[in-house]
């Protein structure tokens, strides 16, 4: 599946019907999604501010709007279609340094030649000359009629996948506001998606957000091939990105799947501390269940064989649910 057919199906399967109101969504994002070790980090500059327990999250880090406070960045600007439910969809929202967020404004994202960059942003600093050290850690901006913003290298893929998500889920209102905005960015953000693949932090953030949005994830984080098939026409390059994520997921869950990747027949190794019943639920990247079966496993190590040879190549989400405790483990399987 590719092109408009894929885009339509992704919208049907992943567009959230449950969205928090804007006040609640900011507090939730700061406190529940992005706070790490009691601090928040700006998506663009890496600047961090403390966020202790017992405070109003949004107000505490805002610092009354000072340049080095933190507020909410809409990667798809509010003035260009991020209104209504889209305004509060956390899959395209991030904490940002107030001044950097303001400078980015409604400018499109894109690569900027160093010689043309007017402002370089790093942590709580700004400069007008090309940095001599750690240049990739800086975001860059151009103002004026031809304004543009380039995020730091380590988050370019995150930004790209947020933009593809927004344009897929809210295309009508995005195009109504400015039919050229996405097209201006498309070539660069396709490349960013390939150059900066999903890492564990982005994967886990996606899962956290889904918890507050009716279980709806950003599918472009789940399956790296979707952006290729829907927008970028470079599937071979894109699809190598998630292999390490798949392996890491398996190692951390007491759930081992092998061989993975594979051709459709694979095995689940389960270690049970007592006799127990499990359900294995396998979904494709459109959220459709393609396999659902219960298993009674014995105390000790168990091996279960699964066959999905009749299904298309791509990523599949495998959920293993302990019926007695209602605890689930989940991982990805890549079928060649």
Question: Which residues make up each language-model segment?
Answer:
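C-terminal tail/sorting-segment detector
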Residues: 297, 305, 309, 313-336
């Amino acid at each position: 599946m590719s092109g408009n057919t894929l885009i339509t199906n992704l919208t049907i399967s992943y567009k959230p019907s449950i969205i928090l109101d804007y006040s609640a969504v900011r507090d939730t994002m700061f406190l529940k999604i992005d706070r790490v070790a009691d601090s928040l980090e700006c998506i663009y500059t890496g600047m961090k501010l403390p966020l202790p327990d017992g405070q109003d999250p949004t107000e505490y880090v805002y610092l009354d709007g000072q340049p080095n406070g933190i507020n909410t960045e809409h990667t798809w600007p509010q003035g260009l279609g991020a209104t209504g439910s889209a305004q509060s969809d956390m899959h395209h929202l991030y904490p940002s340094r107030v001044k950097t967020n303001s400078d980015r404004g409604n400018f499109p994202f894109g690569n900027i030649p160093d010689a043309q960059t007017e402002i370089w942003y790093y942590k709580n600093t700004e400069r007008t000359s090309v940095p001599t050290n750690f240049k990739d850690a800086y975001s860059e901006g151009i103002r004026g009629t031809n304004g543009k913003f380039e995020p730091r290298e380590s988050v370019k893929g995150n930004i790209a996948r947020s933009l593809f998500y927004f344009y897929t889920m809210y295309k009508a209102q995005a195009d109504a506001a400015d039919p050229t905005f996405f097209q201006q960015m498309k070539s660069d953000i396709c490349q960013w998606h390939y150059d900066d693949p999903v890492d564990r932090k982005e994967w886990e953030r996606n899962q956290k957000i889904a918890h507050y949005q009716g279980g709806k994830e950003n599918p472009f984080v789940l399956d790296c091939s979707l952006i290729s098939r829907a927008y970028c026409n470079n599937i071979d390059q894109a699809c190598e990105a998630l292999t390490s994520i798949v392996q890491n997921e398996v190692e951390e869950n007491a759930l081992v799947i092998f061989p993975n990747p594979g051709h459709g027949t694979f095995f689940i190794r389960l270690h049970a501390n007592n006799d127990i019943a499990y359900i294995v639920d396998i979904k494709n990247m459109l959220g459709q269940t393609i396999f659902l079966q219960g298993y009674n496993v014995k105390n000790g190590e168990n091996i279960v064989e699964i066959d999905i040879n009749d299904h298309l190549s791509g990523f599949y989400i495998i959920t293993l649910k302990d019926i007695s405790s209602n605890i689930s483990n989940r991982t990805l399987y890549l079928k060649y």
